[in-house]
Curated annotation (Swiss-Prot):
One family name in Pfam for this protein: SMC_N
Naturally occurring in which organism (per UniProt): Pseudomonas aeruginosa (strain LESB58)
A GO cellular-component term linked to this record: cytoplasm
Cited Gene3D superfamilies: P-loop containing nucleotide triphosphate hydrolases (3.40.50.300), RecF/RecN/SMC, N-terminal domain (1.20.1050.90)
Identification of the protein by name: DNA replication and repair protein RecF
Length: 369
């Protein structure tokens, strides 16, 4: 799975551009502020209908433009080309088109174009709140387990109903009990999917991490969000008074976490910045391997400022792991010479120079393996 064409209009400082990227390695280089990251942001918009740089749309849409648009052609795993398009307006409205038809939700984009982002904010996967790690976990489950999304939607609906009742007390006891049962059933299914995914992820992550850095005492564990020895219905009943006082449900899969520890301590508090980056890269590369194994296509990787925080040895190791995935990768850097020895001679590599928002292809080397 790869993008064969990307057209971008009115995204930040970028001039209108149509790119024909390599199916493997694509390097965007140029000075800081030239627009390299904006190209990755445009691809991210195409795959997820949102920016990774801003929760607000206004900074993403070019000044004096009403909307930004990104179109792409994706070569699917079955060899069929799929056309994607998204237009986002300043007011927040968006239109998604897949093969000429309006799409109902961004989930359809995500399913068609699985994206993995590695950027300077990726440290938040280790340092940030549990919500970030849940999103990482659920992204992986979504892409390997087709039954996950409808169950997750059931869970969200039941959770909204229960939290509304906790705040306003407008449900009769029978309705309350019914929503608690629905919440418990959906939670058990979500927990089972997540647990199965972690069991598959751990050995792949450990093997991938060993290729990047020696951290033998680093462990990955899963907390499901409530006592592992108690049924969620029982926990909900026993915590009802406290939940009413807090105004929301305290236990359940919405409180799950992926715990990453080194010698029993929070890894984020011990690891250097470079080590943290390598751990995050290993996690995201491991997810790519699982998608490949599940025959659900391949990820497209967006790697912003790959050389930062890494010495030459670790840069080369990361390049080789990305190359061995056999998928499409978009990498930004200031100095492309730092990456020139990272690829095998037969790997297709396209180079794009970005200057003052203008993107131009400079070199294509290698041939498709």
């Amino acid at each position: 799975m790869s993008l064969t064409r990307v057209s971008v209009t009115a995204v930040r400082n970028l001039h209108p551009v149509t790119l024909s990227p390599s199916p493997r390695i694509n390097i965007l280089y140029g000075d800081n502020g030239s627009g390299k990251t904006s190209v990755l942001e445009a691809i991210h918009l195409l795959g997820l209908a949102r920016s990774f740089r801003s929760a607000r749309l206004q900074p993403v849409i070019q000044y004096e433009e009403a909307a930004c648009t990104v179109f792409g052609q994706v070569m699917l795993a079955n060899g069929i080309a799929s056309n994607l398009g998204i237009s986002r307006e300043r007011q927040g409205e968006f239109t998604i088109r897949i093969d000429g038809q309006n799409a109902r939700s961004a989930a359809q984009l995500a399913e068609t174009l699985p994206l993995q982002l590695i950027n300077p904010d990726s440290f938040r996967l280790l340092e940030g709140a549990p919500k970030i790690r849940r999103q990482f976990l659920d992204w992986g489950v979504f892409h390997v387990e087709p039954r996950f999304l409808p169950v997750w939607q059931r869970l969200q609906k039941a959770l909204r109903q229960r939290n509304s009742w906790l705040r306003h007390g407008k449900l009769d006891p029978a309705s309350q009990a019914a929503w608690d049962r629905e919440l418990s059933l959906a939670s058990d299914e979500i927990d089972a999917y997540r647990r199965s995914y972690i069991q598959a992820l751990k050995p792949v992550f450990e093997e991938t991490l060993a290729e990047l850095v020696s951290l033998d005492d680093l462990t990955l564990s899963y907390y499901r969000g409530w006592d592992k020895d108690r049924d969620l219905l029982e926990v909900l009943a026993s915590s009802l008074l406290r939940d009413q006082q807090m105004g929301h449900t305290q236990a359940g899969p919405q409180r799950a976490d992926l715990r990453i520890r080194l010698s029993g301590h929070n890894a984020a508090e011990i690891l250097s910045r470079g080590q943290q980056k390598l751990v995050v890269c290993a996690l995201r590369i491991a997810q790519g391997h699982l998608i490949n194994r599940a025959k659900r296509g391949q990820c497209v990787y967006l790697v912003d400022d790959l050389p930062s925080e890494l010495d030459e040895q670790h840069r080369m190791a990361l390049c080789r792991l990305l190359e061995d995935l056999g998928c499409q990768v978009f990498i930004t850097c200031v100095d492309p010479q730092l990456l020139k020895d990272g690829w095998r001679t037969d790997t297709p590599v396209s180079m794009f120079h970005v200057e003052h928002g203008k993107v131009s292809q400079t070199t294509t080397i290698g041939s498709e393996a």
